[in-house]
């Protein structure tokens, strides 16, 4: 098999996005557009990927580090000029080169593989990826002769009335013989209204040299959708989300209403898990088998075990074991580690907290910078007081501890195994194993005094 190379065009500023963020870095389902493109290319056994960068070059290189080499296009003088910037990396090499736009996040590896195969079968010097759409306005048209052989690409503004009725368009993705590409690029002129160097002119140069130019027509236009503004970004995200959600459903996940379920591309979900409408699963979240995630839940970069029930809760950068009940309205903040068979009830918040197996935090509890053992019961309104206004400190609770309602544990503090904290206590000192910790004022009943307070009518 001949060598394979790829050039990704990612130097355009993207002024129509009206954004401080560089265009190809706008995310589509949790990943920058250009990273979608490069990740698909990386599955094709490509020997070298060269990304042409311009505006925001450093940020693009950060996202694609280890996945691509980079060449900077200091002046944006057209697509042919952009590809020519890869001359030092690729010119003179035997093989084929894919040219793909970095703002086409829906392009799939299978389509590019089919393009490469077709290019090889036709023994072409260039093969254009084309598609057919109902309204081709604004796109370059593919002009073929009576035998179906590609003659040229005509831009919409230059097309005759007859040519404008052609519905086969240029998607902007190409496969070239590498040597022929760079030889032709040297002859591309900027003799046009915009004064730029255009890649479709390479097709004309090759045709004028009697080289074979082919066109591979793909079925779906959506893969070629270029994102140039926020409307197209929303459309690309919608199409990508549909693709992601359908893939999960094919693999045994129930999405009750896929149209209202947001799932990032790197999320993994086990079989027989049910995701209700209005759920957001972001980042590199992993969810095990037989889970239920109800409406209004958001899970970000977290690992969820099997048979977990998340009810209208938020989980961020945390780990949850098997057979755990969470919510409703619980908030697991980063670095929470919830072990098996734990109950995290309504209005419970954890942060940098380890919660041991079988422990119950039923309702209205805050546990921050805490290490909680096995089979602990923490009563309603209890708080691990971890911040003194300047520094954070840790609370350690042993196994089989009972913490009564409305208890404050003033960190740093340690409660030993099997200890009992009386309700309403403010614990400022360590409580030994098997001890009762009680720290509250003694109750004093003033007999008959209430009638002087005028609190009743």
Curated annotation (Swiss-Prot):
Residues reported in the UniProt entry to bind UDP-N-acetyl-alpha-D-glucosamine: 9-12, 23, 73, 78-79, 140, 155, 170, 228, 333, 351, 366, 377
Family (UniProt): In the N-terminal section; belongs to the N-acetylglucosamine-1-phosphate uridyltransferase family.
Stretches the record annotates as N-acetyltransferase: 252-457
Catalytic activity: alpha-D-glucosamine 1-phosphate + acetyl-CoA = N-acetyl-alpha-D-glucosamine 1-phosphate + CoA + H(+); N-acetyl-alpha-D-glucosamine 1-phosphate + UTP + H(+) = UDP-N-acetyl-alpha-D-glucosamine + diphosphate
UniProt cross-references to InterPro entries, sorted A to Z: Bifunctional_GlmU (IPR005882), GlmU-like (IPR050065), GlmU_C_LbH (IPR038009), Hexapep (IPR001451), Hexapep_transf_CS (IPR018357), NTP_transferase_dom (IPR005835), Nucleotide-diphossugar_trans (IPR029044), Trimer_LpxA-like_sf (IPR011004)
Subcellular location: Cytoplasm
Positions bound to Mg(2+): 103, 228
Renumbered residue ranges of the record's region Linker: 231-251
GO molecular function, one term: UDP-N-acetylglucosamine diphosphorylase activity
Residues binding acetyl-CoA, per UniProt: 386-387, 423, 440
Superkingdom assignment: Bacteria
Alphabetical keyword list: Acyltransferase, Cell shape, Cell wall biogenesis/degradation, Cytoplasm, Magnesium, Metal-binding, Multifunctional enzyme, Nucleotidyltransferase, Peptidoglycan synthesis, Repeat, Transferase
Alphabetical list of NCBIfam families matching this protein: glmU, PRK14354.1
Enzyme Commission code(s) on record: 2.7.7.23, 2.3.1.157
Essential cofactor(s): Mg(2+)
Originating gene: glmU
Keyword Iron-sulfur: no
Known function: Catalyzes the last two sequential reactions in the de novo biosynthetic pathway for UDP-N-acetylglucosamine (UDP-GlcNAc). The C-terminal domain catalyzes the transfer of acetyl group from acetyl coenzyme A to glucosamine-1-phosphate (GlcN-1-P) to produce N-acetylglucosamine-1-phosphate (GlcNAc-1-P), which is converted into UDP-GlcNAc by the transfer of uridine 5-monophosphate (from uridine 5-triphosphate), a reaction catalyzed by the N-terminal domain.
GO cellular component, one term: cytoplasm
Protein name: Bifunctional protein GlmU
CDD domains referenced in this protein's UniProt entry, alphabetically: GT2_GlmU_N_bac (cd02540), LbH_GlmU_C (cd03353)
Active site as annotated: 363 (proton acceptor)
Region (Pyrophosphorylase): 1-230
HAMAP family (UniProt xref): GlmU
Pathway recorded for this protein: Nucleotide-sugar biosynthesis; UDP-N-acetyl-alpha-D-glucosamine biosynthesis; N-acetyl-alpha-D-glucosamine 1-phosphate from alpha-D-glucosamine 6-phosphate (route II): step 2/2; Nucleotide-sugar biosynthesis; UDP-N-acetyl-alpha-D-glucosamine biosynthesis; UDP-N-acetyl-alpha-D-glucosamine from N-acetyl-alpha-D-glucosamine 1-phosphate: step 1/1; Bacterial outer membrane biogenesis; LPS lipid A biosynthesis
GO biological process entries: cell morphogenesis; cell wall organization; lipid A biosynthetic process; peptidoglycan biosynthetic process; regulation of cell shape; UDP-N-acetylglucosamine biosynthetic process
Enzyme class: transferase
